[in-house]
């Protein structure tokens, strides 16, 4: 073989290889998501004694409404955060990208995301955001069958690419009709960010006749108490007063990495769902049964009966021991969850190496040296868990029993 022939044949092989790589990259960029997760940013909480603890984000957006990424990117982010379930809930009426993406089928974002997740165990939930002015505000419906039945535009504008004109025409259909259409599909329906300052200028969530009637009639099932970078004590109290499911969401429009910086220790707000199995049906059942805890900026927010089993599963203690020739007891507290637990000791003993406030780091441990004054075979250590809320202003309390 001549040198020129040799060089030519290797060029052909290189071009063929490069072409295959490019075709693969193009196919993946528009097709299924890679099953990638990053242990540093993975959101992990243990199962409780009775249920699987599933990590869920029920409010996100893509370019099919006012988000800025393709639905596949939402799936990729969810895989990196090791979510168990994700809903891409596009605004039905507000379509700011209409000039570029006409979006006649409101199920399209779900279809793309579901296809992208096929090679993974991520559950993609079909959902939409009903978008109105107050008092209805914004409402998410998840576990729907067909998003197209939740919108009706009787008199579309002459220029259908006019975003505001289209939105004005679309919101003429009564919000109650849209909610009832979702309810007819057995959807789980929740009130989004009721403290949003564009509709509640003082930032205080207040119940109104529209939502109270739907809650009373079993048509409103949940309420966001944490959305993006915001949390509302008033919304939390409304959830307790009206027996609504606690929901926490990212409501991400840009990138999770930009908004929440998981590479720097941050995390998106999520809803921890205590389900009987890792299935869409089990998640739906748990949401209707109100078995949730919200994780927001390292704060765990939930009803006492749901938060306590999670704390019990997350925190444990080593056997009790004593330093030689002393009455100084030693015990190690272990944490298998993603939350740093900020504990305030409320018992009668004091510590050798700590004051009354102790942090048990996420997936870490801390060794305590306790001064009980004598050698006992068993000690009870009561704590207030300060990064928890079981009601506005009320923290969970635990007792850790340690024995030799």
Question: Predicted regions span which residues?
Answer:
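Charged catalytic cores and adjacent phosphate/nucleic-acid-binding surfaces used
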Residues: 2-5, 30-56, 71-75, 137-144, ...
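Bacterial N-terminal signal peptides that target proteins for export
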Residues: 2-16
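Bacterial N-terminal signal peptides
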Residues: 13-25
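Short gly/pro/ser/thr-enriched loop/turn and capping motifs at secondary-structure boundaries
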Residues: 93-95, 198, 253-256
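Noncatalytic carbohydrate-binding groove/subsite architecture in carbohydrate-active enzymes
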Residues: 176, 184-212
